[in-house]
Every structure is written in C-alpha cells, then in structure tokens.
C-alpha cells in the first residue's frame, strides 16, 4: 500500500473516531436569538448540576433560568470575574438566592464563558452572559452534549479556578 493511501486511511479513521465520540453538537449565533436560546435550553434541560464560568454576567433571563434549575434540584455553582461583582450584574442576585458564587481576582481578567452541565455536556463560545451579547454583539455559542471526555476537561479547569476564588 502506498504511503499516501495509508495516510488517507489514517486521516479517515481519525475523523470517524473523533466524530463518533463528539456527542451531539448544537450551535447558535447572535444577534438573532439563537445563541441565548441555546444557552437557556442547556440550562432548562439540566438534571444534576451546572458549573458556570462567566467573565461578564448581567443577563436576567439566564439568571432566572439558573434559579429555576436550582428549584428543580440542580446544583448550581457560579465562578465570575472579579469585575462581575460590581453593580448591574446578577452575581449578587444569585448569591442572595442561595447559589454558590465565587469571584476570581487572580488574573487581569478571568475571561472564560462556559458551562459544564450534568458532567457530560459543555456550553462555550464567545457569548458573555449579557443582554448586549444577545442583542447587540456578534457572538457564538456551541453546546456539546454527551461528551464526557470534553466535560471532564472543562470540569477540571472549573474546579481549579473555583478553588482559587473567593
């Protein structure tokens, strides 16, 4: 077998293996609403836990969805950049509602925007959890379901950041 044909077979195998284990992938964009709708869907369909790392968090809709998930028995933890502790954010609102919230001030900015949901799903992208991201900015969201390996990697990073935060 020629080396080029072997290389093609290896590439096809890698692509198939990667796709077969990727889980189900959804995506959305803003403006237009599909990004925020996907975030709300990921929260509303959670059953066990949501760990959210947020650079900027002012979206009332997302905060209310998290509180509704908490009422359903979903464990919620929020990790926010230290600037998110200022007024006009929902960090204080969530903390006052009993959500485990920590603020990270170990970096110039903690610029993450991701959720680990039920230890097997990941939502990430450029979308800050804000009204501006939904209505005024060009943003993206990707939601990967049923990918425990990916979720595990994001979970480890969340735990590292959460432990070093106040």
PLM regions and their residue ranges:
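Boundary at the C-terminal end of the N-terminal hydrophobic targeting segment
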Residues: 20-24
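Primarily the HKD phosphodiesterase
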Residues: 41-99
């Amino acid at each position: 077998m020629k080396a080029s044909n072997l290389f093609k077979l290896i590439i096809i195998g890698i692509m198939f293996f990667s796709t077969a284990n990727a889980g189900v992938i959804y995506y959305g964009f803003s403006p237009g609403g599909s990004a925020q709708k996907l975030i709300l869907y990921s929260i509303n369909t959670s059953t066990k836990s949501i760990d959210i790392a947020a650079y900027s968090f002012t979206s009332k809709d997302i905060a209310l969805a998290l509180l509704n998930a908490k009422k359903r028995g979903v464990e919620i933890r929020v990790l926010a950049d230290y600037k998110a502790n200022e007024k006009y954010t929902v960090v204080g609102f969530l903390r006052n509602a009993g959500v485990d919230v920590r603020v990270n001030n170990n970096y110039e900015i903690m610029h993450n925007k991701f959720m680990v949901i039920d230890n097997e799903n990941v939502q990430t992208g450029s979308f800050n959890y804000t009204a501006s991201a939904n209505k005024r900015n060009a943003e993206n969201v990707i939601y990967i379901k049923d990918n425990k390996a990916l979720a595990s990697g994001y979970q480890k990073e969340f735990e590292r950041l959460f432990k070093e935060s106040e």
